[in-house]
Amino acid sequence: LVAPAVWGRVTMPWYQRWLLWLGAHTVPWVTVTGRGLGITPSDNIEMLIELGRDPLIIKETRIGAIYGLVNLMDAGLATAGDLKVPALILYGKKDEIIPKKTTRLMLKHFNNKPRVALYEGGYHMLLRDLPAATVWKDIAHWITNRAAPLPSGADKRNIKSLLGADE
């Protein structure tokens, strides 16, 4: 799971939950963008610019669609413990999209112990960030030999910094 989208309502402040519910039930057709939020999804600026120019990329999202996405993230977070197969969880320490608090809660839900890799310079779009080749190599290595350490050492990094307090 790369930067798992598990930002469920249980970890959202009350005002975000309230505004989402109100918007979805009164004006679900209204669209919003991420402009002005000051969030950086990746360090690969060239790729972000290309995505912004791509006519096939959704740049405005209906509030009703966001409500549905949050429903999916609620389900993902609530059922993380149901995963019975080996898992590799990849998270960028600079992820500004999915809060550490949410990822921490997801990891606590797992019944089995997934392998967790923390990429110090990684953002939310780990597979498109500038050091994406490192992440891809780790995934390929894990697929072929789940018991061996990842080549980057990301699974040996201070995971407690991910599991600790929010910054």
Which residue ranges define each predicted feature?
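Short alpha-helix in the alpha/beta-hydrolase fold that links the catalytic acid
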Residues: V85, P99-H109
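Catalytic active-site module of serine/aspartate enzymes centered on a nucleophile-bearing elbow/loop
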Residues: K113-E167
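Alpha/beta-hydrolase-fold enzymes
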Residues: L1-G64
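Acidic catalytic loop of the alpha/beta-hydrolase fold
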Residues: K59, K94-I98, M125
